[in-house]
Amino acid sequence: MAYALFLLLPGCPITALALAGYGLGRHRLRQADRQARLRSLAALAGAVAAAVYTVGLLALTLTILDAQDNGADSSPLRPCRVAGHPERAANVTGYRVEYVPLRFVCDTTDGDDYSADAVPGWITPVAAGFAVAGVGCACAAAVEGERRARRGAAAA
């Protein structure tokens, strides 16, 4: 499951840069119509969502590297150690990575699991919020284009 990081870690920043370039690269945006502005805003919102998700992926990658360290003080897994609850960490059998929401999950011997504080809590809501805003702006741009096409067809 952690192998998806090999695709996501380089893919998310490239996507963020491409969307930011599209959103900011519109010529004469001040004179542009509403549809072009909405498309640019959708691209910028998508760029922010991808950039924030990249920050979470970096935090998750560092946590995985810490969990894979097999030196002294590696058992129980360092990311699974919870302050004030040493008994939880003593029962950890392994871990898994979840990408939506972005988190590092520690599995225990009794079949239970808990999320380690590896990824900051603000990453998933901010990334999801900007992604939803980007999709909303893209849909609004499509509706605006359809309205303009209908007005043009009615005038002709």
Report the location of each language-model feature.
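Extracytoplasmic/lumenal ectodomains and periplasmic regions of secretory and membrane proteins
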Residues: 67-99
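Membrane-helix interface/capping segments
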Residues: 28-31, 61-71
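Membrane-interfacial loop-to-transmembrane-helix junctions in polytopic alpha-helical membrane proteins
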Residues: 3-7, 31-41, 116-119
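Individual transmembrane alpha-helix segments
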Residues: 97-130
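Membrane-embedded alpha-helical segments of integral membrane proteins
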Residues: 1-22
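Juxtamembrane interface at the cytosolic side of transmembrane helices
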Residues: 19-44, 133-156
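Internal/C-terminal transmembrane anchor helices
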Residues: 36-59
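C-terminal region of N-terminal signal peptides and the immediate post-cleavage residues
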Residues: 1-5, 54-67
